[in-house]
Curated annotation (Swiss-Prot):
Interacts with Der. It comes from the Bacteria. The lineage of its organism: Bacteria, Pseudomonadati, Pseudomonadota, Gammaproteobacteria, Vibrionales. Residues 1-73 are annotated as: Disordered. GO terms for biological process: ribosome biogenesis. This is Der GTPase-activating protein YihI. GO terms for molecular function: GTPase activator activity. A GTPase-activating protein (GAP) that modifies Der/EngA GTPase function. May play a role in ribosome biogenesis.
Amino acid sequence: MSRIKKARKPGMSSQPVVVTRNRTDRDVESREIKRKRKRKGLKAGARNAESNAEQARRNAQKKDPRIGSKKPIQLVVEAKQKTTKQERRLTNEQELAMLENDAQLMVLLDRLDSGENLGTGLQKYVDEKLARIEHLMGRLGLLDDEEPEEIEEFPEFAERKAKSDDDLLAEFDDFNMDDFK
């Protein structure tokens, strides 16, 4: 039998059928999963192609670090003057002011005043700072001398300090050990 060709003639069918589809979330998710399954593996011909990360790394290695610097370069080199120890060292007044305003030292002194025991490291820190403050006050003349009172209490020590070496040697020779028995 011979084939009969269908002809399209207007009015043959009543009205064109319009189909509307509502895509639910599940349909969209299933399509994404299906697309991912189809695209497993690497791209075709990617065996010899370099990745972008590798290309960027190689370009970074080839780049000359001298090119593109915006930092101004001095043509004449000026020698830097080194500060001497005396210039770097604080004056006694400045150091004393810094030690008196030391917040950590003040907190530790308050803890000591309240009767709290400090650890060995903290106690050593406090002792060092207080000794330094006392030394600086002595150098600046702000320290009240308590030594003359001690000399008045023990006059025999004051006499010994005033003697010369010859006097001490003569006293040693004349010393009688029987006095201590």
